[in-house]
Amino acid sequence: MKIKVTLVKSPIGYSENQRKVLKSLGLGKMGSSVVHDDTPNIQGMIRKCAHLVAVENVAE
């Protein structure tokens, strides 16, 4: 299964660690989206910055 992660809130004012997680997910600018495999690793990264991103399932 794949998931689409979209940056919906600016990381300005949040910790450096959360900004690094967003960068490692491949999210840079507001509104940018990436598609990832639904793995425990990716789920943990999303959990760290859940207040900044929107997640939706994608049909393969």
UniProtKB/Swiss-Prot annotation:
Subunit: Part of the 50S ribosomal subunit.
Cellular component terms (Gene Ontology): cytosolic large ribosomal subunit
Source organism superkingdom: Bacteria
Family that this chain belongs to: Belongs to the universal ribosomal protein uL30 family.
Origin organism lineage: Bacteria, Bacillati, Bacillota, Clostridia, Eubacteriales
Keyword annotations: Ribonucleoprotein, Ribosomal protein
One Pfam family named in its UniProt record: Ribosomal_L30
Protein name: Large ribosomal subunit protein uL30
One GO MF term: structural constituent of ribosome
Stretch forming the signal peptide: none
Annotated InterPro entries: Ribo_uL30_ferredoxin-like_sf, Ribosomal_uL30_bac-type, Ribosomal_uL30_ferredoxin-like
SUPFAM superfamilies (UniProt xref): Ribosomal protein L30p/L7e (SSF55129)
HAMAP family: Ribosomal_uL30_B
GO biological process terms held by the UniProt record: translation
The organism of origin for this protein: Desulfitobacterium hafniense (strain DSM 10664 / DCB-2)
